[in-house]
Amino acid sequence: MKIVSIEVFATELPLLRPFIVAYDAFHELPSIIVKMTTDTGIVGYGEGMPDPHVTGETFYSTYEMLSRDVAPLLLGENPFDIEKIHKIMSAAVYHAPSAKAAIDIACFDVMGKATGQPVYNLLGGKVHSSLSVPYVISILPPEEMASQAADAVKAGYTSIKIKVGDDPATDVKRIRAVREAIGTTIQLRVDANQGWRNVATTMRVLKQVEDCEMEWIEQPVLADDIIGLAEVRQKTTIPVMIDEGLHGDKEMREVIMRQAADLINIKLMKCGGIYPACKLVAQAEMAGMGCQIGSMVESSIATAAGAHLSIAKSMIFSNEMVGPLMFSRDFGVLTYEKNELLVMDAPGLGVDVNEATVRELSVQSTLIQ
């Protein structure tokens, strides 16, 4: 089997409502879609969701990199040779994880379709019976966040994740308001997205909310301050999760060496796809660290990829693959029942991609063959 063409689409996905985090506010999200065709006629789809604040890539840089620097080198390669393909990509471009993730995911979609297996069977088989997801609330006034959280609990959610990080004093009010609104039996996750920046600010906030029984605090300090994150972990009783500070093997080694986090948030867009994510899971298992599969608010394509990985690995205890719930348009359909994402058992990713929608939402596309 050989890759005979790769088509790259630069698309924009409309959100149901603005999504506000510590570093930006989004009204639509850029997504790079890859359509990979083989000489056997099998077609696989992949997705890259770049973010300058997280992956160091922009929408158009990712599109151009895939179109000019990566895709042409992969023509004639076998999608099953996934390690070789990653080596080719790494030799061609440094870092660029979401660009590489788009190719990686398309390869796994092809492999699953070629073997007649869902991707999770290529990763070890189904180890979890279901995938539960939290209700995610972006940065808003405390009373609005509390109201959304209460409504989510009434709708059947058992875990609430809130975004904070734009103002420490208001963040304390947000955390307290949401905890009061949802009671003590619902899990509460707090994500600062680097917004508290340093140890001093982080500890000032955490000392005021330690009684709020948070499941964890995620990435409170700047991404490259792993030493600072380790200090936070030493000074608080709240479990600490690293997100933006963890991309690949280099950061993982330092996190383990410095005992900088209790938990890790793996995102396919940060590490380069399913194949490198499996390596991070193995390292986390060696270090005894629990894993979450997070999301860059991706479409059904990359969300499905994360779901297949999550359901196949015992060390992955948490999932935040909620992107499809946040878009008014999508390229495919994933099924959610209350707080559960239903597993896709069809071959490949299990997503029936609507190519007409991909083309309609594209602002630019190119075919490499």
Name the predicted role of every residue range.
Residues 124-236:
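Metal-dependent enolase-superfamily TIM-barrel catalytic cores that perform enediolate-based chemistry
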Residues 105-137:
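Glycine-rich, aromatic-flanked loop segments that form ligand/cofactor-binding clefts
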Residues 4-15, 26, 31, 297-369:
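Flexible C-terminal active-site loop/helix
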Residues 46, 131-137, 160-162, 188-192, ...:
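Hydrophobic faces of well-ordered beta-strands that scaffold small-molecule active sites
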Residues 1-64, 68, 362, 366-369:
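N-terminal basic, low-complexity leaders that serve as flexible interaction/assembly modules and, when applicable
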Residues 5, 37-114:
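Metal- or metallocofactor-binding catalytic centers and their adjacent structured scaffolds
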Residues 207, 213, 224-241, 246-340:
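Shared catalytic-loop signature of beta/alpha-barrel
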Residues 3, 34, 41, 70, ...:
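Conserved, mostly hydrophobic/aromatic
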